[in-house]
Amino acid sequence: MAPADLLQPLEGQRAETLRLIESLMAGDLDVVVRGDGRTVQQLLCHLVDREHGINFAIRRALEGEVLHLSQEEREQISRSEAAPAPAGWDLLRIRTELVEARESLRQTFLLMREDDLDRAIRWPEWPARTIRTSIPYMLEHEDSHLDELRAAIDRERKLVS
């Protein structure tokens, strides 16, 4: 199987995320998601940020460099993810950013050969140690946030009606 073919489950998951975005209204972006208190907008922007970060780590691995983040660097990532979502990122912008982030990841995978999938990669909080073994974590990450988003929107709509 070609490396880019391994993105099919991720692309299916992204299609679900995009369908959710299409069902949202502008006011839904301010709904608070249970858990860490982020809003729908912040969580969607987090998906964009995380995908760019993963793509960066994979590209470094393809160049023979394994990222090793210090505790301080990990904490900095956590702080930046907790920061307010970019001002002016409406539903259309978020959708566009998610599509572009996935296309960028796809381009990275198109550059790979089969043996590249076994290159070392490290990403904070994931036990995966190769590009190949990171793919299920990428899928689970977006899927779990999509569940949180759906629950928050459903809860909010029940309160309003």
Whereabouts are the PLM-identified features?
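Alpha-helical bundle segments that constitute or directly flank the non-heme di-iron/ferroxidase center
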Residues: 1-28, 48, 52-60, 137-140
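Short hydrophobic/aromatic segments of transmembrane alpha-helices and their interfaces
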Residues: 12, 26, 99, 127-128
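Alpha-helix N-cap/loop-to-helix boundary motif
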Residues: 2, 9, 35-39, 46-50, ...
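A short, mixed-charge helix-start or loop-turn motif at secondary-structure junctions
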Residues: 1-3, 83-88, 127-131
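Acidic/histidine-rich alpha-helical segments that form the ligand environment
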Residues: 9-13, 78-118, 134-138
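A structural signal for long alpha-helical coiled-coils and helix-turn connectors
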Residues: 22-25, 62, 113, 153
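Short, contiguous alpha-helical
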Residues: 30-77, 117-161
